[in-house]
Amino acid sequence: MSEKEELPLTLTSIGAATATSDYHQRVGSSGEGISSSSSDVDPRFMQNSPTGLMISQSSSMCTVPPGMAATPPISSGSGLSQQLNNSSSSKLCQVEGCQKGARDASGRCISHGGGRRCQKPDCQKGAEGKTVYCKAHGGGRRCEYLGCTKGAEGSTDFCIAHGGGRRCNHEDCTRSAWGRTEFCVKHGGGARCKTYGCGKSASGPLPFCRAHGGGKKCSHEDCTGFARGRSGLCLMHGGGKRCQRENCTKSAEGLSGLCISHGGGRRCQSIGCTKGAKGSKMFCKACITKRPLTIDGGGNMGGVTTGDALNYLKAVKDKFEDSEKYDTFLEVLNDCKHQGVDTSGVIARLKDLFKGHDDLLLGFNTYLSKEYQITILPEDDFPIDFLDKVEGPYEMTYQQAQTVQANANMQPQTEYPSSSAVQSFSSGQPQIPTSAPDSSLLAKSNTSGITIIEHMSQQPLNVDKQVNDGYNWQKYGQKKVKGSKFPLSYYKCTYLGCPSKRKVERSLDGQVAEIVYKDRHNHEPPNQGKDGSTTYLSGSSTHINCMSSELTASQFSSNKTKIEQQEAASLATTIEYMSEASDNEEDSNGETSEGEKDEDEPEPKRRITEVQVSELADASDRTVREPRVIFQTTSEVDNLDDGYRWRKYGQKVVKGNPYPRFSSSKDYDVVIRYGRADISNEDFISHLRASLCRRGISVYEKFNEVDALPKCRVLIIVLTSTYVPSNLLNILEHQHTEDRVVYPIFYRLSPYDFVCNSKNYERFYLQDEPKKWQAALKEITQMPGYTLTDKSESELIDEIVRDALKVLCSADKVNMIGMDMQVEEILSLLCIESLDVRSIGIWGTVGIGKTTIAEEIFRKISVQYETCVVLKDLHKEVEVKGHDAVRENFLSEVLEVEPHVIRISDIKTSFLRSRLQRKRILVILDDVNDYRDVDTFLGTLNYFGPGSRIIMTSRNRRVFVLCKIDHVYEVKPLDIPKSLLLLDRGTCQIVLSPEVYKTLSLELVKFSNGNPQVLQFLSSIDREWNKLSQEVKTTSPIYIPGIFEKSCCGLDDNERGIFLDIACFFNRIDKDNVAMLLDGCGFSAHVGFRGLVDKSLLTISQHNLVDMLSFIQATGREIVRQESADRPGDRSRLWNADYIRHVFINDTGTSAIEGIFLDMLNLKFDANPNVFEKMCNLRLLKLYCSKAEEKHGVSFPQGLEYLPSKLRLLHWEYYPLSSLPKSFNPENLVELNLPSSCAKKLWKGKKARFCTTNSSLEKLKKMRLSYSDQLTKIPRLSSATNLEHIDLEGCNSLLSLSQSISYLKKLVFLNLKGCSKLENIPSMVDLESLEVLNLSGCSKLGNFPEISPNVKELYMGGTMIQEIPSSIKNLVLLEKLDLENSRHLKNLPTSIYKLKHLETLNLSGCISLERFPDSSRRMKCLRFLDLSRTDIKELPSSISYLTALDELLFVDSRRNSPVVTNPNANSTELMPSESSKLEILGTPADNEVVVGGTVEKTRGIERTPTILVKSREYLIPDDVVAVGGDIKGLRPPVLQLQPAMKLSHIPRGSTWDFVTHFAPPETVAPPSSSSEAREEEVETEETGAMFIPLGDKETCSFTVNKGDSSRTISNTSPIYASEGSFITCWQKGQLLGRGSLGSVYEGISADGDFFAFKEVSLLDQGSQAHEWIQQVEGGIALLSQLQHQNIVRYRGTTKDESNLYIFLELVTQGSLRKLYQRNQLGDSVVSLYTRQILDGLKYLHDKGFIHRNIKCANVLVDANGTVKLADFGLAKVMSLWRTPYWNWMAPEVILNPKDYDGYGTPADIWSLGCTVLEMLTGQIPYSDLEIGTALYNIGTGKLPKIPDILSLDARDFILTCLKVNPEERPTAAELLNHPFVNMPLPSSGSGSVSSLLRG
């Protein structure tokens, strides 16, 4: 019942009658009252009803009280009192519990309403209770507003305060207002504002409050709609939408999607077009991209600007042979640009410029055709073949078309319709055309494929239409606006290029209908006259003159492909209805107008069978006639398939765009074919389609019979007893050639019945051979399919979906280069078989391939899950739609319901849990970059059923932590070979040679760091690779799509500022220094570092450097560049020298500049004194020179007046002024760095006093003024309370140091090295934080200063100090004491032994020092002791207590010999009750003395300090004597020679001479000369081992006992001692190391000669032992002939039953590997070693030997730094997999492991490159890879990682050695000329190589 029919509530005479209140009548009303949609009302007033209706909580019935007699209705009039009196009685009040008497017929007392009437006008009912209204009008009811207890007002459900009694304010609405609002429910009352975060009530019909636009009218002209949001505009005019232009935040204007500044609200300037302009152009998108635009004398040109011409002109600069003409062109166009010449003027200039340059005109036309589909033609004659070269449609004038025809030697075939014909077209009467011309309509055609149309003269239109006054009138709402002027004449030429489609376009004013002929086989249209001049339309007598001349195929040979690809069209003549409805058709880009339904499937086609032209107005008004289209029956319309979309607009049907042709790529996943009339239950098809769609499968459902099928992976054919596809033969014929699976479904019949009922399908093959059809029917029954007879349809559908998913998931995977391994690793983490709910996070930088990997995983495993949900670009979706909407969409997909059914506020947790716990779900959340994006999902994910998996991708690792993801997988970048696959050479192959291309490719790959998105961008960029390579090297700003937009996405202000600072200034700088500066700038550095690392934008290297990938750094710099592309002075950060120079010289700096880093190399210019005055926000200033030897820079001839007070960093090398500016306030300065400056004082006069007395230096932490030669003193630093670092090295004019330095409690580092005029040092006892103090070179410093006890490193070399006070013992934390070249130092206190933490003591050059203190105390930590060039003549006995000593240098200053060192690298604590004491033993008779000692037993290893003796400048191998070892018992005090052995001459100054001279006399005993004494001595030895002499036979056996084992030794080849004598007997010593062939031990002969031998087990060789021994012995025989200073000499072999022994020269310093493990090797040391290795390799290669095993472990070092190649030549007889040599193997060795003749000396060069890399980095190449991966990488040519921190020469040397092609590697002789090998050595004062060993 409607509102107008509502009646007041009355009591009927029926006993229990009920009546519905006014309010509840509205609830029950279907069309009015309160809406049944829950979205229109406040949820607080909703109850849990299944329909979602709002049910009132008050009673909806009014019932007569019990016991009350039924009475007739109370009526008005004079009989009212009588009725009441008659009904009154002595009855009690009917209210329960009331004992009062009833007042009247109401049955109630006065207190309960008896006797009182309702106060509602015209209401005669009794009041209810104590209220003044009856029950129907609110009496007795309470306000339903939440929490309100007042009575309802009137017939409403609310009190007066909450809307009761008030009416809706919406226009003529008479409903009651809802709640506190001024509107009813229908018009917004009770609803909440939908603005995110707003909780106010909606105001007006839209769900927005007044603050957000509710109730406001649109402010756009005469619009009557309601405003949306805060915009003040309705949705039609852009309200609630933002401008789509990037970085624009203004509201969109109208439907354009753009603000007014970017084109919104403006109309297209094309004649006849009423659409809005697109962007900043003057035309809509359709006029720019859909049809060609006009260029004529009227100046109507579509969007071509002077800038377009300038861009093209600059691009073709090289094509101008005359540079002056190019300059003229450029000057003309620039004048046009600056003078603001209009479009017509620009066109005129362009035509003049391109005269005589047809090639440039053609190129410019091609450029414009691609951008705007516009073509400019010259005014004069032009070649006929020009039209064939122009791409796309073009336009020309009528005169130009005549020129084309004349050049083609053709006469135009012209038909001129008479005026009567035109009149007949207007009136609709049939007329026969004549040949008389009419000026109102001119149509010409020719056979050259060009159609020329001249518009009719402008005709006046009706007022409702368009006024024809020569201007384009546009209608906007109720207003008409005068537009642009029509051109006086317009000729349009369309180059169609297809003989099957001839088109005549209507005139721009819409007065001519468009006629289209479609003929697949070039047949004549139906009902066409034989003369070809007139076409009569079917069903109508109306005729229109048109062109029917056929176009020859030869004229369109270039378009042959297009002709073949055209779809067959039905042979009919159609007319396009050109009306305003065409504006609603879809544009070519797929956009649809508002309100139009965007359908996935094409609508049914409709055939036009009759065209009638109806008269719209009287003919005398000269109005236009519109064609009205009439159709046949629906069945015939449905069967129409002419390739075009037909849309219905009211009663009209309009021909739309053609259907898209199916491309060669897959268009659909599944196509379903069925007969619509044959399926009795259409629900089966709909359920099947819905099930497929829920699994993310694209489905094309087709019941019409068409020949062409879209490409698909699965084709489902539903076969019935009466249906089979008409193209079944075609389907089966292409079944084996197409990648498609066909599944037949036999619907309600078996396959047997299907074949038996073949007679029912005769109608399909009446025209074909029955045998083929019978075979086809039989074949389809044998194909895998489904039969639906008694089976449940739901089960069958599930089975079909599963099989379809298997087929789709087995499709060809995307070519993911380098991702397969990572996909498998993630799948192993997912553990699909497990039943737990597991989540995986995929983490990596932007563009690394996270989404691609997730999609591939989804493709692989989605078939195993019941429900799969993929949310792509989740962060963006949340930003656009909001959290609630995204979660509702997510739940709708998981629960498989429609999105509008789910409401977050309505759904219950228990319902979710119960539904989801029964599902096995796969969820992929892509691009989750904020925890808040998935915060609402987290609880839902916990409800998933067993076996569910959640995969989340993000750039932010912290998201995974907050979301409590089980496993996080970091995506790895591509390696070099796979990265190179993504780079496309393109045109570079023509220009670049393979070598140059390879070099550039590697540079680009290094820049990309294996990021696929960056590599794809670099491969597609159109810049030359040479220029691009230079940009990459200098990390210039580069815009990388996708990377640029997402780099700063999600960064807060702190992280963004740190990110840009590092990208521009601080990349690969020490983290602590960067953090110090950033903290001083107000950033939270460590928090920002952590955030950037989590977001994959930054890494912290193992050397504590902040490291940013090159492409991310380039992107960050591009962000800064785009702050102001044209004005560098408006950017926040400057680092480019050219830009900075421009800013300095032209004084264009602004307050926007925050940082300047200028490399002054090759720069020299003058700047004005106030160059920094405008840069008030400058906080980082660094002027430096990258090459120290080049001194250039900025000079200030007039001085410097200003520096910004906000500076945190002032780094200025070669500062040219004597002091800082007076106006400079350093209150914010964190680092002051002025090395090599001309400053004499930092501040002058009052400024100096101000800085020292105030807290202006409170933030200063680092001050460096090194090598400032003119600096005489530094100011007081008492205010710099946070100063931590002071560097005054090289300030040789500095006279004194201020006493204020003692107040610097936080000072850690103080360097005064080279301050030669400094005499006194203030007390530093109170510097409690001081750790490093360097006073070296303070040559006038004579007193030992008072130093803080916390100092760890003290350098005092080169001073005048004579003695070290005993108070040095107070420096309990001292680790290093350097007193080198302290020539006046005479003695050291014994208290020096109390320095328990001292590790290094350098006394080299202390020539006055005569003795080293002797003490029984142990210095357990001392590892290095340098006593060279001192006057110490004898080592104290306490030297043996230095148990941790690794190296001891000792030189006799009088005789310049010898040096004593201890090379052991490691030491451990002595076991209890064990001791170690060094002893020196010898024989004074013949000076044969050895250094001996007891064995030191330690935990885990056995070690004995070894003393190496150097006798001259070079090292003689025979002079090396080693001590100790794994020999049981003590060695004899004197090792004697056998009488038969040859005794070599002992030169003076040799080892023996040295030990004899320095050893204590008591340790030297006379030797025994008789053999008997020697034998007796040996027999009484307690070692358990015996020296057994070998006889004269070839072999001899002897036994060596060691524990419980014994073995017999037999000599197989002569073993030579160091002096050429035979070794007749020997003893095994300590283990030196283990190699690939066996273990290496120290050996000692009976004559005291030490050597090394390799013990190789013969048992490992099996049955091939004998053959293998022969090969080894033959190799050793050859190797023993080699004599070179850089090659370890082989001395011979011997063997026993189980082992082979190979004897070699003993080199005692150890291998290069042990050396770099102990010390970091510098470039100069590695260069020295490399040159010696090359010397040895050259010698070997010249002799025809190949080392085959070059690595640091096989390169031994002597005490003087001489290297010797060892362990070579034997790799040939070893298996590849048995040796760990693969880290250094060359690719050809990997590829041919057993073909030793397949590679040669270049293999050694590759190994040498790896060895040099190992020495420089301290890491074995490929050590981070497994052996299989490493071998694969080497075999494929992937180089090991080469750090960027290496020098250029070192990198070049390594890359030169690591050429993949062996033929490209240089020889060892060629490498000896490389700059890296010839690097000069550092100076060494002592002449010792120990300094080199320390690097």
Curated annotation (Swiss-Prot):
Segments annotated as LRR repeats: 1206-1227, 1228-1249, 1259-1281, 1282-1304, 1306-1328, 1329-1351, 1352-1371, 1373-1395, 1397-1419, 1421-1442
Gene Ontology CC, one term: nucleus
Domain TIR as annotated: residue spans: 666-808
Domain NB-ARC: 800-1087
InterPro entries in alphabetical order: Disease_R_plants, Kinase-like_dom_sf, Leu-rich_rpt_3, LRR_dom_sf, NB-ARC, P-loop_NTPase, PAH, PAH_sf
Keywords: ATP-binding, DNA-binding, Kinase, Leucine-rich repeat, Nucleotide-binding, Nucleus, Plant defense, Repeat, Serine/threonine-protein kinase, Transcription, Transcription regulation, Transferase
Binding, ATP: 844-851, 1632-1640, 1654
Name of the protein this chain belongs to: Probable WRKY transcription factor 19
